[in-house]
């Protein structure tokens, strides 16, 4: 019997003195000349590894299961069966505890019935908790925050958008923790109300101040900006109080409603707008969550049709 070109190692004694020893059940048998033991060298681990490579490409990439079938040579039926097995074996959720955890919280709608609420450690850039709810309301978020308490995390701050439900829930469960408003959300919402080209001097001046929000980095910047906002209000207080009567309905509405709404939005957010200046470890925006949601929805569009459990 001929020696192997690519020499195998005996699994029993480790010898490389191996010879072919016939065929059984369509598998090549080998015999060790050193210890006399015979064995069949199968490679199930390679097959399993290959399957997982295709699974990763499907889950994390942009290929559909039809694309994977065409590239890999496996049938769609086999791929679905293998992938379902992997999906049923969800990875173990491990939380890394450390001092001064700064949490980003936000929600997004995956469809009309499922709202994903995500809690992310800003320092570790890791999701520490998530939940699905029928609506992004105060009670659902309180339930999540109570679950966070059981993890015994040392939470130092929360950063969120202007959702009243999130703000009330955090205030209820963590009344003494710093709450930072996302300055990007504040700026974006205010600019949407003021439009790109305001028609009044009040709107033009306020828009200029709004565009400075995300560039405020120091205590001096903060104090100077707040001073300008107060001066703006002193100058235009009567202007934003003006009302117009609808001739058809007789209803009175604010004449410059968008300018007024922008100022009120800033005024309400102001107590929690600049926590990050006193503590630079506190993130001042939830951009990383917005980016994560964007990638997640891109993947969900590729995998549309999967069951809710998966």
Where are these regions (language model features)?
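Short, positively charged, Gly/Tyr-enriched micro-motifs
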Residues: 14, 19, 24-103, 107-114, ...
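Acidic/histidine-rich catalytic cores and adjacent linkers
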Residues: 29, 41-43, 51, 157-167, ...
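Conserved beta-strand -> loop -> alpha-helix junction used to position metal-binding or nucleic-acid-contacting
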Residues: 158-164, 169-207
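Short metal-coordination and nucleic-acid-contact micro-motifs, chiefly zinc-binding Cys/His arrays
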Residues: 3-9, 25-28
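RNase H-like nuclease fold core
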Residues: 72-164, 168-176, 269, 288
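Short, surface-exposed beta-strand-loop junctions and turns on beta-sheet-rich folds
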Residues: 38, 124-125, 302
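Mobile genetic element proteins and their domesticated derivatives, centered on retroelements
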Residues: 18, 32, 68, 79, ...
């Amino acid at each position: 019997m001929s020696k192997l070109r690519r020499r195998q190692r005996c699994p029993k004694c480790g010898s490389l003195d191996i010879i072919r020893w016939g065929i059984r059940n369509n598998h090549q048998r080998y015999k060790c000349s050193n210890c006399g033991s015979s064995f069949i060298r199968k490679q199930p681990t390679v097959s399993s590894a290959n399957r997982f490579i295709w699974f990763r490409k499907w889950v994390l990439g942009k290929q559909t299961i039809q694309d994977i079938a065409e590239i890999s040579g496996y049938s769609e039926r086999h791929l679905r069966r293998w992938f379902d097995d992997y999906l049923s074996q969800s990875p173990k959720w491990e939380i890394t505890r450390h001092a001064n955890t700064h949490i980003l919280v936000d929600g997004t709608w995956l469809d009309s019935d499922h709202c994903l609420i995500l809690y992310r450690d800003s320092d570790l850039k890791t999701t520490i908790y998530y939940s699905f709810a029928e609506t992004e309301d105060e009670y659902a978020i309180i339930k999540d925050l109570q679950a966070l308490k059981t993890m015994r995390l040392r939470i130092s701050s929360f950063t969120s958008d202007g959702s009243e439900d999130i703000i009330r829930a955090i205030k209820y469960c963590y009344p003494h923790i710093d709450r930072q408003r996302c300055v990007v959300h504040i700026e974006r919402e205010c600019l949407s109300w003021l439009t790109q080209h305001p028609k009044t001097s009040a709107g033009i001046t306020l828009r200029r101040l709004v565009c400075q929000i995300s560039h405020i980095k120091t205590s001096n910047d903060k104090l100077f900006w707040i001073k300008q906002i107060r001066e703006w209000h002193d100058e235009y207080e009567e202007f934003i109080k003006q009302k117009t009567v609808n001739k058809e309905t007789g209803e009175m509405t604010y004449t410059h409603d968008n300018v007024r709404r922008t100022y009120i939005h800033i005024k309400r957010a102001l107590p929690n707008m600049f926590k990050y200046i006193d503590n630079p470890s506190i993130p001042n925006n939830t951009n990383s969550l917005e980016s994560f949601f964007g990638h997640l929805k891109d993947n969900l569009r590729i995998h549309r049709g999967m069951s809710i459990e998966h």
